[in-house]
Amino acid sequence: MYSSYSSLQQSQLAAQGYYDTQSTYLLVYAPGRNTALRATLADQLHRKFRLADTLGSALTEWVDGVLLVSEDVECMSTALMCFAKALQDGADYAVCNAVFGFGGATALYQSRAHLAQNRCALVSRPLLERCRAAAKDPENVTELLALAAQFCAHPARIPQALLHYERDICAEDAFSATGKRAFLMSHVLDMTGAPIVLVSAVPVLRSMGYEVVVLGPSDGGALQLFVDAGAAVITRPGIRATPNLWGLALCSDLVLVNTVVMARTVRALSGTAVPVLWWLHDAFAGYPHIAHQIPTKLAENVRLYSVGHHAANAMHAVRPDFQIGQLIYGLPDYAAEDFPRCDLGYPADKPLFATVGSFERRKGHDIFCAAIRLLPEEVRNKATFLFVGMAADKEMMDAVRSLTTDCPENVFYCKRLSRDEIKNLMEQCTCLVCASRDDPMPTFVTEGLIFGKPSIVSEHTGTAGVITEGVDGFTYPDDDPQKLAALLEWAIFHPEKLAAMKAACRKLYETHYSKQSFEQTLTAAVKELTE
């Protein structure tokens, strides 16, 4: 039994608690083909249930709720227990996440903002009676499911993937029957910049009346951010080479494709009836590997936008004729949130300079390390330096490890911080440093602006184009460690002047990166594309 579950289901089952639900009597109504369902019902931990193919005579006075099943499906052994627990907790309608396809490689995480056309849902007895009274055919399970989703007052979404459909996923599994559909496609769902800022598009699209579904590979940390924002999420490894899932886009009213990495998808959708907004966040470094997949021409249904001039210039280097608008991302005002405060443990009597991002050559960690080494020892010892990020390049990682070994008292490395820890870092640091050789619009620098923290950035970043030198940040040219070191030395001796930049940094955030600014720009772009 256990070995037949998908890897996602196995991991969730290992963390699943047990609930005593045996006092709740469930009816499982599956009038159609139910071979797989019947087999998996034999393994249920919740034993107080009955499988029926008609409702009338089966609806005895002891039935507390009915699991409506319109399609044959395999249930995990904890499925009825979780549905019964939702009923006990006051839900009148409960659905769960699911996996699809052979082996369950595709997973659906239900939206908290809209109810999809679920083919399996638990309905309370009072709600079922209301649905039967309103139905043209009180025995029609599909009609009852649709009415239950419409009439329910207390819906519950169970976070476990309790169901496994052997077929491929379709649009109706994620979208409702009547809403406008926005389909967002991302090549990663990790905590890097592009997926994090894509999250900010979800509430904007929802405010425009769209139901939002996100397609990406397996969760790398950002999936829950999309769910919390109100999107449904579909995951499948290798989506860049899975054209059958791209077909979901053709069932949508708007498609937002994130980054140039999804160029094959744009090529497939160019010339179709669905409007496509292609949002570019990419640096020059990635284009040699992807340029052959970028269409030479784009049909009228595709519009390009970038997070700044740096990202636009990177695309223009290979497709100079493309028209690209500006769509700088917006981030929530984290400083106004009531997040858990904690002391990160770095010396409070020294200015803290931090950089956040994956360790790859274009991010320039070696330049930052070289600049720190160029500081006179007595100057370097007056400050603390922190590197945060996953090691993607051995040379960059070796540069940081060597520096932390030589300067263990004031140079530190952290592989990863949680979102709340990042917010605490931005609140507690003195200045951010982005030494990138090629970076369209570094997210962590923007997060620093939210907390009024200035940054020192390379001229080869998108941020350099919006900074006012010496007012809300600093730039240095030529990827030169010596010039970066000079700015660091000045900053180390003048932390009070960095602190005095707080108001200007906040103004820069509110002008270019706030949710309000982003909402206005994205709304205008979507209306231009769809109206």
Feature locations, PLM:
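Conserved donor-binding/catalytic core segment of Leloir-type glycosyltransferases
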Residues: 179-186, 347-363, 369-372, 386
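Short, structured helix-loop element that forms part of the nucleotide-activated donor/catalytic region
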Residues: 220-229, 384-409, 421
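Short hydrophobic beta-strand element within catalytic cores of glycosyltransferases
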Residues: 215, 454-457
